[in-house]
Amino acid sequence: MARYIGPTCKLSRREGTDLFLKSGVRPLESKCKAEAAPGQHGQRRGRLSDYGVQLREKQKVRRIYGVLEKQFRNYYKDAARIKGATGENLLKLLEGRLDNVVYRMGFGSTRAESRQLVSHKAILVNGKTVNIPSFQVNVGDVISVREKSKNQLRIQNSLGIAGQRADVEWVDVNTEKKEGVFKRCPDRADLPAEINENLIVELYSK
């Protein structure tokens, strides 16, 4: 499956906000020009139409979670079939991806790095190797680092970085054992306030 492998700052600048695609806890402004869009005329940010605002929000969320367009639309369709608010269901499905849970537990410093750990068979789910980043984690599942991968320097560094971030209330992590439990699905209040999932619902409802 195709993945974007270009400069991650360009994506954050395109959306005008930090998409947390880089490792570390420094704000985007200290890493690249956050205020300007990429390109020769990046300083010019025109006024967007309602459709443009909705599209940008969808692109922002899609890039945060590293999901391609077709897959993102499928997530939306699944979310619409679940009882409750479609937008909130969409975010919960994205949060339940294995690569995202690995990131939330601190084993990867970014979602891209976490996706690589999963693809390289460094992650176990309930004691079994799973190498599918989109694998949907269930409440109560135990996520752990494979024994032969536990001494990887990047995992050690990632756990150190994760210790500087805000606590993730819906996972319980044992950093010494390098394993964690997906305790519950996150509530909407647990997730970033700067995401407006209702704009995505409006976009796909047209």
Swiss-Prot record:
Checking InterPro entries in the record gives: Ribosomal_uS4 (IPR022801), Ribosomal_uS4_bac-type (IPR005709), Ribosomal_uS4_CS (IPR018079), Ribosomal_uS4_N (IPR001912), S4_RNA-bd (IPR002942), S4_RNA-bd_sf (IPR036986)
Query: Which PROSITE patterns does the entry link to?
Result: RIBOSOMAL_S4, S4
S4 RNA-binding domain span: 96-156
Any Pfam family hit: Ribosomal_S4
Organism's domain of life? Bacteria
- Molecular functions (GO terms): rRNA binding; structural constituent of ribosome
Protein's UniProt keywords contain rRNA-binding: yes
Write out the entry's keywords from A to Z.
Ribonucleoprotein, Ribosomal protein, RNA-binding, rRNA-binding
One GO process term, biological-process aspect:
ribosomal small subunit biogenesis
Gene Ontology CC? small ribosomal subunit
**PANTHER family tied to this protein:** 30S 40S RIBOSOMAL PROTEIN, SMALL RIBOSOMAL SUBUNIT PROTEIN US4M
Q: Quaternary structure per UniProt? A: Part of the 30S ribosomal subunit. Contacts protein S5. The interaction surface between S4 and S5 is involved in control of translational fidelity.
Q: Which family does it belong to?
A: Belongs to the universal ribosomal protein uS4 family.
Functional summary from the UniProt entry:
One of the primary rRNA binding proteins, it binds directly to 16S rRNA where it nucleates assembly of the body of the 30S subunit. With S5 and S12 plays an important role in translational accuracy.
- The name this protein carries in UniProt is Small ribosomal subunit protein uS4
| Record organism | Saccharophagus degradans (strain 2-40 / ATCC 43961 / DSM 17024)
Upper lineage is: Bacteria, Pseudomonadati, Pseudomonadota, Gammaproteobacteria, Cellvibrionales
